Regions:
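Bacterial Sec-dependent N-terminal signal peptides
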Residues: 1-21
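N-terminal module-boundary/linker segments of secreted carbohydrate-active enzymes
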Residues: 21-54
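Ligand-recognition surfaces built from glycine- and aromatic
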Residues: 22-30, 108-110, 122-126, 202, ...
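Secretory/extracellular carbohydrate-interaction modules
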Residues: 53-57, 61-177
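Surface-exposed coil/turn segments at beta-strand junctions on protein surfaces, enriched
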Residues: 65, 104-106, 202-206, 215
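Short tryptophan-centered beta-strand motifs in secreted/extracellular beta-sheet-rich domains
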Residues: 113, 207-215, 220-222
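Short, aromatic/His-centered strand-loop micro-motif at the edge of beta-sheets
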Residues: 173-210
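Short strand-turn-strand beta-turns centered on an Asx-Gly dipeptide
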Residues: 224-228
C-alpha cells in the first residue's frame, strides 16, 4: 500500500446513490469488502454489491430494511468451507477484489461499528455458544514472504473480539519471548494467545453496542460504548510488523447440530 494512500470505506445501512447520498434505491456499498459464508461461498467487489439479488447470499447475508440492519446469520451448512467453525464474515479489501493490498501499523486504521447480537443458541452444558464479531488479522507482505522463502503469506490474527455469555471478550496475540527479533518476529511460533484477556465492563447481552477500534504504531485503543478505553501499548504491539486488515461478522465458534446465531450490523466504518 502506498504510504500516502487515504482510504475511507463506509457501510451505512441504507441505500446509496452514485453520489454517496442515501436513497431508496441501489445496493448497500460493500465495494471494499469480501464476504465468506458458512457454505464456503465467497464474493467481493461487483459480485458482492448485488448481494440482495444473489441466491447464494440468502439465508446467511441480507438486509433488514425495516431495521436498517445488515444481517449475518450463522449455522452449520454443507458446502466448500474449510473453516474450523461456522464462518460468516466480511474481510476488508483496500483494493476491491484483492487480498494483497493491506495496511501496516505505521499507516494505522480505525474501525467503528454499531452492532447487536440478536440471538445465540446454547450448548449441551446450557451455556450460550460464542461468536467472533470483530478481528484484526495479520499477514506477511509479499516482500516479507519472499524474504522468508515461502510461497504463501504467514497469516495470524492480532486481535479478536468475541461475544461470550453476553460480554465482549478481547483476546490478542503477544510475544512468547520479548527478546525475539528479526525474521523470527514473522513466525507464528513466536506468538501466543495472551492469557490476560479483557472484557467489556458491562454485559451487552442482546442490546446494541458501539465499538471503536484504533490501531497505530505501538498502540491499540478499544472503546466500547462509553466505558473506559482498553489500551494496549507494549512491546508486542510495537513489534508487530505484519500488514493487517479488519474482519467484521458472525464467526460462530461451533459446528454443533442445531447451533445458530444472528448478528445485526447498523454501522461499519473504516478509515486509514
Amino acid at each position: 500500500m502506498k504510504k500516502l494512500l487515504l482510504i475511507t470505506s463506509i457501510v451505512t445501512l441504507g441505500y446509496f446513490s452514485m453520489s454517496g447520498q442515501i436513497t431508496s434505491r441501489g445496493p448497500v456499498d460493500l465495494w471494499n469488502w469480501k464476504v465468506e459464508l458458512p457454505s464456503g461461498y465467497k464474493a467481493s467487489d461487483w459480485k458482492l454489491s448485488n448481494f440482495h439479488n444473489d441466491r447464494f447470499a440468502a439465508p446467511f447475508f441480507y438486509l433488514n430494511e425495516d431495521e436498517s440492519a445488515l444481517v449475518l446469520e450463522a449455522f452449520p451448512s454443507e458446502g466448500t468451507s474449510t473453516a474450523k467453525y461456522t464462518r460468516n464474515t466480511l474481510r476488508e479489501q483496500l483494493q476491491a477484489g484483492s487480498n494483497d493490498v493491506n495496511w501496516t501499523m505505521k499507516e494505522g486504521g480505525v474501525l467503528e461499528v454499531e452492532m447487536e447480537v440478536e440471538s445465540m443458541s446454547k450448548g449441551a452444558n446450557g451455556q450460550y455458544h460464542r461468536t467472533i464479531l470483530l478481528q484484526v488479522d495479520g499477514r506477511t507482505t509479499s516482500k516479507q514472504t519472499k524474504q522468508l522463502g515461502l510461497e504463501k503469506p504467514v497469516s495470524l490474527p492480532m486481535l479478536k473480539i468475541y461475544w461470550q455469555e453476553g460480554y465482549l471478550k478481547v483476546v490478542r496475540k503477544v510475544l512468547k519471548d520479548e527478546s525475539t527479533a528479526g525474521d523470527a518476529l514473522l513466525s507464528k511460533n513466536s506468538w501466543k494467545e495472551d492469557k490476560n484477556t479483557k472484557h467489556s465492563e458491562s454485559k451487552v447481552g442482546f442490546e446494541k453496542v458501539r465499538v471503536r477500534l484504533e490501531l497505530k504504531r505501538g498502540k491499540i485503543v478499544l472503546q466500547i460504548n462509553d466505558e473506559r478505553p482498553i489500551v494496549y501499548r507494549d512491546l508486542s504491539v510495537a513489534q508487530w510488523y505484519f500488514e493487517n486488515y479488519f474482519t467484521v461478522g458472525n464467526y460462530l465458534q461451533t459446528k454443533d447440530i442445531g447451533s445458530h446465531s444472528t448478528v445485526n450490523y447498523y454501522k461499519i466504518e473504516v478509515k486509514h
